[in-house]
Amino acid sequence: MSMACAPAHAGCAKADFEAVVDEAAGSLRDMNAANKPKFQEKLRLLKDKRGWTQEQFLHEAAPLVADDKINTFDLQSTALLEKIASGGETGAAAAKPDCAMLDTLRASMKTLVETQAEKWTYMTTKIDAELAR
C-alpha cells in the first residue's frame, strides 16, 4: 500500500478523497484480521496456562486489553478516524478539490495505521510477557 503523498500542485479529484477513506478502512481491516486471531489464541493459551475459570479470565486478562496506554491509542485512533472521514466527505463534496487537504488526509491515514500497529505491538508484547511468566 502506497502512503506517499502526491504534490499538491499535481491535481486531484473528488474520488481521491473517497479513496483515502476506503484505503484507511481497508488497512485497518487487514491489520485486525492479521492480529486479532493470534492475540485471541494467546489469550486462550494464557487462560489454560493459569487454569483460570472464565470469570477469573475476564478479570485477570482485562489489563491486557485495556489500560491507560491502550486507551490512549484508542483515543488517538478515534480522533484520526473522525478527521479522515470528515475530510474525505468535505473533499468529495467540494466544488474544487483541495489537494493540500488530500495530502493532510493521507498523512492522517498513515498516522492512523502506525498508531494501530503500535497498539497491536504493545498488546502482543504484554501478553507474550505474561505467557513467559
Predicted regions and their residues:
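C-terminal amphipathic alpha-helix
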Residues: 14-17, 31, 35, 90-133
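Short, Lys/Arg-enriched charge-dense amphipathic segments
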Residues: 23-31, 36, 56-68, 117-124
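Mid-chain, structured segments of secreted extracytoplasmic proteins
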Residues: 51-94
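Heptad-repeat register of long alpha-helical coiled-coils used for dimerization/oligomerization
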Residues: 11-14, 18-21, 60, 64-67, ...
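Immediate post-signal-peptide N-terminus of mature secreted/exported proteins
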Residues: 8-55, 132-133
